[in-house]
Curated annotation (Swiss-Prot):
The gene is rps6. Component of the small ribosomal subunit. It is found in: Cytoplasm. GO terms for biological process: cytoplasmic translation; glucose homeostasis. The modification Phosphoserine is found at residues 235-236, 240, 244, 247. This is Small ribosomal subunit protein eS6. Pfam families: Ribosomal_S6e (PF01092). GO terms for cellular component: cytosolic small ribosomal subunit; nucleus. Signal peptide: none annotated. One of its GO terms (molecular function) is structural constituent of ribosome. Belongs to the eukaryotic ribosomal protein eS6 family. Residues 216-229 have a biased composition (Basic and acidic residues).
Amino acid sequence: MKLNISFPATGCQKLIEVDDERKLRTFYEKRMATEVAADPLGDEWKGYMVRISGGNDKQGFPMKQGVLTHGRVRLLLAKGHSCYRPRRTGERKRKSVRGCIGDANLSVLNLVIIKKGEKDIPGLTDSTVPRRLGPKRASKIRKLFNLAKEDDVRQYVVRRPLTKEGKKPRTKAPRIQRLVTPRVLQHKRRRIALKKQRTQKNKEEASEYAKLLAKRMKEAKEKRQEQIAKRRRLSSLRASTSKSESSQK
């Protein structure tokens, strides 16, 4: 089995092949995201702690977190699921994935070093690969350089040198995201003002509608009362005429 080991602190990654079954036994029956001591791999790994981050079986199917089995299953996957990238909007597909429990049928196991041991591993912990790009978000730049809210973040942007033959050397900087500028604050104030105007307008319209509704209801009530009074007058008139006719007979 091959072990793909990465060390985030230095940015290095190394693929080693282990043939001894006894060394690999410590990773069997362990689920993804489990932290395991790497001491059985050899004396140079003494004190190291690694986390199982994934792997592939001998047919190339990836391990999927949450699938509690050794074998393969076919799952209906959509956007946002691991082990699947949709080609069209809303597309879903049934894909074969391997369970998250490790065993001898894996061809590659991915490990992440979470605790460094006593000795350095050549090509993994003894060298550092610099990051190509710096942070882009304003809060992350502040965190990197330990800046206060009052400090100007734009002066601390990590610039990337661009060199071309026969041209002046120049640098390129990312556009800072979530940067609080006077323009942003002005837009925020405008949004709040527009929201207040909308609420005020809605209140006024609601009060006008309530007044109009009350007026219409009052008019309807008066009309209904007039109709009732008219009916009563007519009924009393009929009653009086019928009495006079009966008395004449």
